[in-house]
């Protein structure tokens, strides 16, 4: 059985043909072109891809992991700040009418968390809180394969969480880290990305290391709040910069241990995402199979 799964972000649309075990038969990506083509352009790209896939493979269903706040019952986009013309997109209605296949739609952070719980860093955890650190910072709570959505489907929107240094988005995102290091080093911010920042840290740059330490302290404030509130088995950290586990793990573990008594720390500690770019599609597949 083959399923068509997508992970729709502001920059790229990732897609894959996946079997029921989570094995990818084919995958790829294409630019979202969100600012020029908006929501209607994304719908056109996805539908065109599925039509091409169907010429080679019969499909069992379609799973969408997508940016934005999602009405999972209706399968539509309630709100999407970063993609013009995307709010209100009725994905489920469009896809089921066009292809006559079962379809699920879920928020991308929720799907990534579920993918890590099913086939990634959270496989041995009954419950986990996933934190994705990138342009902003997002979260999702999974317990026994179920996503906590909240009353208005905004559970896990930790970007708005307040910590001593300010709003978590403003003080614990990859955007913050790169911007602050560029500012402190008087470098062109357009030329400073995560790779540049961690290269400086590895080279022993004191300025970059000091900013990274502040970033880790700020992030640990947020993680401590999450541990107190949700008491998960573990916290899974994802996003591009979390590939730097060797540098980040000791700093974050030390900072978290300084904030909480041992009994309140996640029993299985911090884990770093294993499935990365595939996690959202795997989470969508898991939900699709649960629907059957």
Residue spans for each PLM region:
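Short hydrophobic alpha-helix segments
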Residues: 27-30, 81, 151
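Glycine-rich phosphate-binding loop of actin/hexokinase-like ATP-binding domains
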Residues: 123-175
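A charged helix-plus-loop insertion that forms the helical arch/lid used to bind
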Residues: 76-87
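ATP-binding/phosphotransfer module of carbohydrate and carboxylate kinases, centering on a glycine-rich
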Residues: 1-61, 72-76, 93-101, 115-125, ...
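A short acidic/small-residue loop/turn micro-motif
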Residues: 32-34, 85-86, 155-157
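General beta-strand structural signal in soluble alpha/beta enzymes
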Residues: 103-107
């Amino acid at each position: 059985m083959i399923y068509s799964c997508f992970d729709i972000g502001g920059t790229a649309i990732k897609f894959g043909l996946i079997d029921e075990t989570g094995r990818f038969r084919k995958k790829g990506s294409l630019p979202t072109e969100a600012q020029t083509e908006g929501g209607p352009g994304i719908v056109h790209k996805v539908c065109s891809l599925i039509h091409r896939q169907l010429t080679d493979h019969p499909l069992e269903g379609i799973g969408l992991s997508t940016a934005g706040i999602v009405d999972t019952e209706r399968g539509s986009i309630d709100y999407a700040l970063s993609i013009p013309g995307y709010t209100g997109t009725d994905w489920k209605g469009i896809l089921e009418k066009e292809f006559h296949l079962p379809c699920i739609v879920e928020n991308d952070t929720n799907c990534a968390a579920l993918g890590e719980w099913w086939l990634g860093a959270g496989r041995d955890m009954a419950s986990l809180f996933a934190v994705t650190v990138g342009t902003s910072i997002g979260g999702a709570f999974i317990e026994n394969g179920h996503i906590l959505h909240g009353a208005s489907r905004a559970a896990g929107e930790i970007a708005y969480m307040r910590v001593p240094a300010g709003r978590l988005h403003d003080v614990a995102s990859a955007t913050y880290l790169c911007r602050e290091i560029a500012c402190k080093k008087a470098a062109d911010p357009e030329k400073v990305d995560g790779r540049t920042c961690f290269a400086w840290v590895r080279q022993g740059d004191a300025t970059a290391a000091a900013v990274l330490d502040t970033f880790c302290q700020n992030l640990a404030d947020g993680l401590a709040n999450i541990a107190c509130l949700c008491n998960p088995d573990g916290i899974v950290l994802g996003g591009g910069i979390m590939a730097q586990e060797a540098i980040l793990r000791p700093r974050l573990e030390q900072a978290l241990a300084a904030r909480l008594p041992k009994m309140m720390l996640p029993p299985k500690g911090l884990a770093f995402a294993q499935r990365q770019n595939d996690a959202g599609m795997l989470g969508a597949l898991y939900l699709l199979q649960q629907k059957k």
